[in-house]
């Protein structure tokens, strides 16, 4: 977490225009929780920039956290240089589900590259979480990963 403490007085890597301490830093230090899906998206991007993999894990929907491989996430973070984040669109899908489309710029082996994605976020007990589409997901008739009690196809699965 030493990268976090040195970043507190700097501009936030999420490019919100705020200092890290007043932006994603308060989420990383668990002084507050993101109030919107976009704030969570920005804080997760910043966590990757700062190589704060524990934050990536705890902000993934709880039912998926044990499916993540922190060692692989750490290796990926260690080998990636992030250069910028652009939020393209934020959508409120339901009262507890939102989508954030973003473009993240990173240094590739030979040139800058961009990763564009539409991520789904779900609010569980007043906290936002990322629904990770890269891990095993339930079948459409199984209960949703968010714990809503609905079938996956009628809940988060309908947005992935």
From Swiss-Prot:
Short name of any one Pfam family annotated for the protein: SEC-C
Transmembrane segments: none
Matches recorded under InterPro entries: NTF2-like_dom_sf, SEC_C_motif, UPF0225, YchJ-like_M
Region forming the signal peptide: none
Gene3D superfamilies xref list: 3.10.450.50
Family (UniProt): Belongs to the UPF0225 family.
Protein name: UPF0225 protein CGSHiEE_01665
Source organism phylogeny: Bacteria, Pseudomonadati, Pseudomonadota, Gammaproteobacteria, Pasteurellales
